[in-house]
Amino acid sequence: MEKYHSNSRFAPFRDAPFALRGALGSSGSSFSSIDSLRRSSTLEQARGYTSRPLGAVRPKMLPSGCRPLHTSHPLSAPVANRPLSPHLPLKKPQLSATFSISHRIFGAALGAAIISIPLATKFSLMFDV
């Protein structure tokens, strides 16, 4: 264990858990240039996670009126803070949904009519109505 404390490659990661030292300080990987850029933030994250109990990770708070974006490039401020869905009159009506709903309504009405006519006939003959 002392060889890791004296090794210069692991020197910045003395406070990180032993299991994370290899992942944080691997210089033989093809991503070593990217790793060197992210070492300070990764080390701060590792220290932050180990200083709290498991499951007590601090949630990232967003300012009021902002929402997280699932994009790889930054967006301008007006685009990033626009509402999640526009007003309904701005949308074009979806004909497939309209046809589906009307088809179900007319199908239920037709089915009720087909079933009710024989039932009405049977009960009218049965009760001499």
UniProtKB/Swiss-Prot annotation:
Predominant place of localization: mitochondrion
InterPro entries membership: SQR/QFR_C/D (IPR034804), Succ_DH_cytb556 (IPR014314)
Source organism of this protein record: Oryza sativa subsp. japonica (Rice)
Subcellular location(s) per record: Mitochondrion inner membrane
A GO BP annotation: mitochondrial electron transport, succinate to ubiquinone
Protein name: Succinate dehydrogenase subunit 3-1, mitochondrial
Low complexity bias (residue ranges): 25-35
Role summary: Membrane-anchoring subunit of succinate dehydrogenase (SDH).
A GO CC term assigned to this protein in UniProt: respiratory chain complex II (succinate dehydrogenase)
